[in-house]
């Protein structure tokens, strides 16, 4: 295995973090990773929020349905996309994955919390004073893992096919 596949295969969603802060150099590096994601027509329709303040993270956690753990994470990223760009969702999801893999490469665990289709998306945008025209695509809680729970992945034969799909 090479370093990239090792990082990808070692990544797991973590919802319980140590209180240790994530360093500014790591944050800058993972933002650069996110900004280098592939994007349709080079639109780069993203805006990245870096949320270190516990009060802000707690307010966001209160707005979410499945992201209450954001309040206890030492860091959260908010990824927004320009709604007027046709492929903002695909582009911003690619950026979110790059962000998560960049964190993992630095030994920082994370958990992606959905945003785009959630009723709280507009409330988060307003809370963070993000301009109209952007919509929340994802929230990513991040930090050093306190607890890692590994769930098994589906068998490859159940999720992949070659040439054409054939029912078993």
Map each language-model feature to its residues.
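Acidic, surface-exposed loops and disordered segments
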Residues: 1-168
């Amino acid at each position: 295995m090479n370093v990239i596949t090792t990082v990808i295969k070692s990544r797991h969603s973590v919802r319980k973090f140590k209180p240790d802060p994530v360093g500014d150099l790591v944050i800058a590096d993972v933002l650069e990773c996110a900004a280098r994601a592939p994007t349709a027509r080079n639109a780069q329709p993203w805006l990245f929020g870096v949320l270190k303040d516990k009060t802000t993270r707690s307010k966001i956690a209160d707005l979410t349905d499945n992201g209450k753990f954001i309040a206890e994470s030492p860091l959260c990223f908010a990824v927004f996309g320009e709604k007027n760009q046709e492929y903002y969702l695909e582009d911003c999801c690619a950026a979110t994955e790059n962000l998560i893999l960049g964190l993992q490469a630095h030994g920082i665990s994370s958990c992606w919390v959905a945003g785009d289709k959630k009723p709280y998306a507009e409330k988060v945008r307003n809370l963070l004073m993000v301009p109209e025209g952007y919509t929340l695509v994802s929230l990513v809680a991040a930090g050093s893992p306190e607890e890692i729970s590994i769930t098994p992945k589906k068998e490859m034969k159940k999720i992949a096919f070659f040439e054409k799909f054939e029912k078993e």
